[in-house]
Amino acid sequence: MKNKFDISVYRYIGISIMAVLGTSAFAQQDSALNRSVTVERDFQPVIQAAGKVSTRPAVVETEIEPTKVEYSEFSADVQPSATFHPLLSQPTRFDASKPYNGYVRGALGHPNTLFDFGYHLDDGKKSILDVYAHHKAEWGLATLSKTKVGLNFTHPFSTCDLYFGVNGGNVYYHKYGHFYDYAAYGVNNRDFGMWEKNKVAYANRQPLTDRDKTALWTAEVFVGVKSNPKQDVQYRVQTGYAIFAKPGAVAEHQLRTHGSFDWHGEEHHVGTNIYMQNNFLQLKGNLTTIPDSLYRSRHSFRIEPYYQYEGKRVRVHVGVNLDVNLGHGQMLSGAKNVSFAPSPHINLEAQIAKQWLTIYANIEGHHGLGSLQEYMEENRYRIIHAGIIEPHCAAYTPVDAEVGFHIRPYRDLLLEIHGGYAYMMHQDVWVASTKDSVLFAPLNLKMMQGDLTYFHADYQRGKIGGQINYHLQDAVRINLSGDYYFWSGDTTVYDRPNWEVALRIDGRINKHWSVYSDNYFAGNRLALSYDGTNYTEHHMKPTIELNAGVEYNMWVGKAARKAKGDSMTLRPEPKPNLTLFLQLNNWLHRKNDIYYGYRSQGINFLLGATFRF
């Protein structure tokens, strides 16, 4: 499921409200190595293009990215980064037209719904208010609905900015992974053949119970202060409260504290980043019988001291992450309730040959927070009870290293070649639980339960890969990326493909019409099921996800009428403020395996519009 396109699938031009991302991004938790295949893949480059040092004039406009529309989620460990690097285009001849302050987007399809809203209110002198709302859902058997609303407010003072934010969200979904498989005996081969042919149809007929329908709620409020860019010492301090809850079962109360300080003199920086989270569980129902208070509180602390050099053609960041986790289930060290997990944070980028060749290296590590929210967000279909009472440890990656080159043979083509190595500890391996059933006599069948269990394994992963980015003015963009992985571990490697390929093509036919194709491919994976006695391996078929879309951009309102009557001047046309779009997802109607027993929906579509104001 994590780099991303810096243009939206629908290529919404001029959408503003960057402050929403600015403050909320700082409040985000670190996430483990987990990627999602999305219908709209939004990537942000870690390493910039080879020609990043440029004297050409550029117009930079703030944007807020609309909600990602993700319908097929796969457990691929690392998805190849499909990045649109900022290749040089024609210089700006005229002043850019005034950007829009907000947008609203809505779409309906089968079986999907989508809604987005964002508005940026800036008086030009002092306070800034950003309001946003996002909703996306697919319905039916594989229901998955995500909704989030919130606001951010910033008020500048002479030496610092004061800001606060509040948001809330809901995730509602079905644990629809019920299916049947035949046991090792039956009446005759014809019965087995009948079952193999029709077992998917039988699975769709199994009714969901209330236990299979889950709602998770989140809410957060935070306040912070940050220095303005003119200060010699840059700092940011933020504190907040958040809650993650499954009604009737458990609520996790979180206290989150961030801090960052940076002292700099010209090209040299020395600083530190600090993050602390205290989690307190409020148990309900049958979970209240858990006696040990260690089950009910978990605490995470991270500090990263660093040195950074920022030259004209070289950038170096050298730091070390020092993670300490307290609470039940810390299996990383001999003391089961305490873990200490150091990891490097080193980034290097050097422009070897100006405009056409750079080299980069990233050596990083990561330790999870160990919170219940992180536990459930990694895989919503797992058993929540186990995340509270069973000894477990957040995933720990002591090192994840990558070295690569960006090569620009000519102005519109950018190539990337990279290789890497990662050592990952306590990685989750998903297991489908089955139980005996005699619903379809005379066959003795096994019914899968909707909840997935898990165990931990240590893996090592090598990889080689690359990208091809082609950009012809504003008419064609092509991105082809892929990785091949070399896996080894203390057990067989499950839930992870040996290769991945992503292909994205955007084409502009004229100023109104544009089309795109977004595709993802991955090798087959192994999965496990457990019937209470034996583990069984299953081969999941390769993933093929093909998506396509078309959009029509137009101008409506006074700006459009004024531009038509002013065609003899050099004034640029107003930016399109209305986009109509049609998106066809998974048009091969291939139901890819997400986890064993969980398959993605088949062909589906979205028809909608975006209006910017």
Regions found by a protein language model. Give the residues of each.
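N-terminal periplasmic/intermembrane-space "pro-region" immediately following the signal or transit peptide
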Residues: F26-F94
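Outer-membrane beta-barrel translocator/receptor signature
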Residues: F84-P86, F94-V149
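Short sequence motifs at beta-strands and strand-loop junctions characteristic
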Residues: A96-K98, G109-P111, L141-S145, T209-W217, ...
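Hydrophobic, lipid-facing positions within transmembrane beta-strands of outer-membrane proteins
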Residues: Y100, T113-F117, T147-L151, A215-V223, ...
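Exposed, low-structure sequence patches enriched in small/polar residues
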Residues: V104-R105, R315, G319-F613
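Surface-exposed extracellular loop regions of Gram-negative outer-membrane beta-barrel proteins
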Residues: H120-E138, G271-N279, K284, L294-Q330, ...
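Flexible loop and strand-edge segments within Gram-negative outer membrane beta-barrel domains
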Residues: E138-G150, G165-Q254
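Outer-membrane beta-barrel transmembrane domain signature of Gram-negative proteins
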Residues: Q206-G224, Q238-K312
